[in-house]
């Protein structure tokens, strides 16, 4: 299996800054939990833990429960097999490679030039993996998530590495006067 660095570097130029950070955090979570492989639940937990990311608000907009997604992802990571006595090398699991490929495909189908966190969440909803079941259990479906992404993007594509960073800025730094 390929080392983490190789798979992530291969796609680095196509990832938004936020998604790159989430992948790094997923790797840190796998290391901290003594997991041999980085799995989709690590990445799901990483995006849910990002206070400045858009995952929680996107899930909420899609009618889901972000706290439940986060709690269930944490529980799933806690249940993963632990390996002790390794050199601290973690590898990308097959499921995560599959999801990253699906994520890239979702982004390309939408005309995005960069792969974003929201495309990862969307790709997950189309799989039979535990991370997908966590989203479904919290009320997130592919159809609802697609509608939420469309509403957040306002028809725009992700055209640069900072594409998802500025989206919630207006909401964050303004007061709703209605």
Identify the role of each PLM range.
Residues 1-178:
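Histone-fold recognition with a strong bias for associated Lys/Arg-rich disordered tails
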């Amino acid at each position: 299996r390929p080392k983490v660095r190789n798979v992530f570097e291969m796609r680095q130029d196509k990832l938004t800054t936020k998604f790159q950070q989430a992948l790094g955090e997923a790797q840190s979570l796998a290391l901290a939990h003594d997991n041999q492989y980085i799995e989709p639940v690590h990445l799901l937990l990483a995006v849910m833990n990002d206070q400045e990311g858009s995952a929680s608000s996107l899930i909420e907009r899609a009618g889901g429960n972000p706290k439940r997604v986060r709690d269930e992802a944490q529980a799933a990571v806690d249940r993963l097999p632990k390996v002790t006595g390794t050199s601290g090398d973690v590898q990308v699991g097959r499921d995560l490679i599959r999801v990253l490929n699906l994520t890239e495909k979702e982004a390309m189908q939408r005309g995005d030039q960069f792969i974003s966190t929201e495309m990862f969440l969307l790709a997950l909803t189309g799989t039979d993996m535990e991370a997908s079941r966590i989203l479904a259990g919290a009320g997130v479906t592919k159809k609802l998530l697609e509608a939420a992404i469309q509403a957040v993007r306002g028809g725009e594509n992700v055209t640069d590495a900072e594409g998802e960073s500025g989206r919630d800025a207006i909401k964050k730094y303004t007061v709703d006067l209605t």
